[in-house]
């Protein structure tokens, strides 16, 4: 159970579902059961590897902030957690190789990014946020590469990455008091809350504008407009200095935008 817990299975399942969504909008999810199972499994394992190695590098911080986590609680040794994460990365990449070369290449690249993020990028301003946004967006792209890559999947990946980047910046704003107390090098700590809110808003506006370029029908346009309304409400909360409320609206908007893609594809 400890090996499963350190993978954070809920996050793994959500990532796997995102990859299947990318496959779905590429029009190949329902053609056979074999490839979707491989796609879901590869993403689940690589995400689990990323979560496990993240716990490995965060073990000293978790000993203070989250002593109940598997490593600081003593339920698994740091060495065992590291070996487990490497095994998950290898298994995920091997499965990706069974799909096609494009999926294997992306799996290898994302495994590398997950390792570098946990080891180096997490504590750097902007770089860590961009890494998380990239990983979120390419989860959808992975599913598309397993099928027949399309502009729709590319748009879904880009829009997801942009919305995630905005949300990551807002999360850092919300955590600013604690980060300043501990000397964390986040973007808001460098440029301040106001400029960070402006940047997060601009990123979200770019995402909203790009959403209308997606080559889907009027049903999609109507549905994505509702999602964009949620994003506008998020920006309004930013202008009011409400990071927590802004985050909630971004999450709602992302969910609505995903539904818009599915509606546009007549699911």
UniProtKB/Swiss-Prot annotation:
Single biological process term from Gene Ontology: glycerophospholipid biosynthetic process
One Pfam match: UbiA
Protein's name according to its UniProt entry: Digeranylgeranylglyceryl phosphate synthase
Annotated GO MF terms: geranylgeranylglycerol-phosphate geranylgeranyltransferase activity; magnesium ion binding
E.C. number: 2.5.1.42
Family: Belongs to the UbiA prenyltransferase family. DGGGP synthase subfamily.
TM region(s), chain numbering: 10-30, 33-53, 80-100, 104-121, 139-159, 198-218, 247-267
Gene3D superfamilies cross-referenced by the UniProt entry: UbiA prenyltransferase
Membrane topology: Multi-pass membrane protein
NCBIfam families in the record: PRK12882.1
Keyword Lipid biosynthesis part of the UniProt annotation: yes
GO CC terms of this entry: plasma membrane
Keyword presence, Lipid metabolism: yes
Catalytic reaction list: sn-3-O-(geranylgeranyl)glycerol 1-phosphate + (2E,6E,10E)-geranylgeranyl diphosphate = 2,3-bis-O-(geranylgeranyl)-sn-glycerol 1-phosphate + diphosphate
Superkingdom per UniProt: Archaea
Compartments reported by the entry: Cell membrane
Keyword vocabulary terms for this entry: Cell membrane, Lipid biosynthesis, Lipid metabolism, Magnesium, Membrane, Phospholipid biosynthesis, Phospholipid metabolism, Transferase, Transmembrane, Transmembrane helix
CDD domains: PT_UbiA_DGGGPS
Pathway: Membrane lipid metabolism; glycerophospholipid metabolism
């Amino acid at each position: 159970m400890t090996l499963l817990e350190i993978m954070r299975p809920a996050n793994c399942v959500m990532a796997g579902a995102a990859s299947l969504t990318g496959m779905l909008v590429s029009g190949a999810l329902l053609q056979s059961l074999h490839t979707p199972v491989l796609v879901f499994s590869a993403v689940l394992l690589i995400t689990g590897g990323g979560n496990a190695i993240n716990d490995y590098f965060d073990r000293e911080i978790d000993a203070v902030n989250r002593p109940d986590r598997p490593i600081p609680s003593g339920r698994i040794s740091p060495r065992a957690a590291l070996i487990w994460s490497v095994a998950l990365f290898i298994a995920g990449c091997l499965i990706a190789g069974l799909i096609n070369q494009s999926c294997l290449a992306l799996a290898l690249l994302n495994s590398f990014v997950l390792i570098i993020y946990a080891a180096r990028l997490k504590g750097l301003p902007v770089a860590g946020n961009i890494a998380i946004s990239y990983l979120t967006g390419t989860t959808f792209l992975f599913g598309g590469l397993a099928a027949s890559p399309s502009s729709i999947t590319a748009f879904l990946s880009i829009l997801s990455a942009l919305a995630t980047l905005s949300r990551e910046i807002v999360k850092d704003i919300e955590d600013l008091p604690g980060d300043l107390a501990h000397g964390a090098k986040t973007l808001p700590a460098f440029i301040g809350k106001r400029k960070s809110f402006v940047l997060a808003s601009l990123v979200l506006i770019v995402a909203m504008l790009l959403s209308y370029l997606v080559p889907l029908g009027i049903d999609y346009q109507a549905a994505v407009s509702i999602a964009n309304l949620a994003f506008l409400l998020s920006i309004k909360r930013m202008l009011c200095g409400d990071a927590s409320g802004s985050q909630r609206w971004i999450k709602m908007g992302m969910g609505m935008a995903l539904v818009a893609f599915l509606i546009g594809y007549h699911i």
